[in-house]
């Protein structure tokens, strides 16, 4: 594995990320969610894509793709491991979203190219990274109240907002992926909350990928 080459690719791609608001449709008619997981001891990469109507946030379509994993787990290089399955799921959607939430980092990455940014560049869609853990940077400790907020800073640059979306839950790291500003990323996530820790697009993507009860109930209603 030539990590030096991958690192150089990340730096080059990161220079093409658009950190300004460039939505083709604002407000969006459809918002997507993406989540990646692994099966069979990491041998298979599974990606789930969901499509929600906006502003109702009603689930209208989902796709799951499973492909052979082509790269081992290497911190800082996860997007190279995850994007092939994401692309396979994306290509199955009959309707593409106007805005995509990705479970993972955007520019809040040591080389400013998390999976939300990498995938956003690949398909040229506005993306937001919604991560559950810090990858780089520092932030001031948050109060326990829901809504507590702090900028994630690295080398004098704001990479994300750290936001406690729900009481007694760890905060989310919300960042530009591509074609969405940092402040707008936070605002869009806040518009897509329904009382859970995660915004609806990535919550549904996780539910579909993992076969959670909410998704099972949704399937039963559709029959």
From Swiss-Prot:
GO molecular function: deoxyribonuclease V activity; magnesium ion binding; RNA endonuclease activity, producing 5'-phosphomonoesters; single-stranded RNA binding
Tree of life domain: Bacteria
Broad class of enzyme this protein falls into: hydrolase
Annotated GO CC locations: cytoplasm
Catalytic activity: Endonucleolytic cleavage at apurinic or apyrimidinic sites to products with a 5'-phosphate
InterPro entries reported for this sequence: Endonuclease-V (IPR007581)
Keywords (A to Z) from UniProt: Cytoplasm, DNA damage, DNA repair, Endonuclease, Hydrolase, Magnesium, Metal-binding, Nuclease
Cofactor(s) needed by this chain: Mg(2+)
Site (described: Interaction with target DNA): 73
EC number, as in UniProt: 3.1.21.7
Keyword Zinc (UniProt): no
Pfam families on file: Endonuclease_5
Entry similarity comment: Belongs to the endonuclease V family.
Designated name of the protein: Endonuclease V
Species the sequence originates in: Salmonella typhimurium (strain LT2 / SGSC1412 / ATCC 700720)
């Amino acid at each position: 594995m030539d990590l030096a080459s991958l690192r150089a690719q990340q730096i080059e791609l990161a220079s093409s990320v658009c950190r300004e608001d460039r939505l083709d449709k604002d407000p969006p008619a459809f918002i997507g969610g993406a989540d990646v997981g692994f099966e069979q001891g990491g041998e298979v990469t599974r990606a789930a894509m969901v499509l929600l109507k906006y502003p109702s946030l009603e689930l209208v379509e989902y796709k799951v793709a499973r492909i052979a994993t082509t790269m081992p787990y290497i911190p800082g290089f996860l997007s190279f491991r995850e994007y092939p399955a994401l692309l396979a799921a994306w290509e199955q959607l009959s309707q593409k979203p106007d805005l995509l939430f990705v479970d993972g980092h955007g520019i809040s990455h040591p080389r400013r190219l998390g999976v939300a940014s990498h995938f956003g560049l690949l398909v040229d869609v506005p993306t937001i990274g919604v991560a559950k853990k810090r990858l780089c940077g520092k932030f001031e400790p948050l109060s326990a109240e829901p809504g507590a907020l702090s900028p994630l800073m690295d080398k004098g640059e704001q990479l994300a907002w750290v936001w406690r979306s729900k009481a007694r839950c760890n905060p989310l790291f919300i960042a530009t992926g591509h074609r969405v500003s940092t402040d707008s990323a936070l605002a869009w996530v806040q518009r897509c909350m329904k009382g859970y820790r995660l915004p609806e697009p990535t919550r549904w993507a996780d539910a579909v990928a993992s076969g959670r009860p909410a998704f099972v109930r949704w399937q039963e209603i559709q029959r």
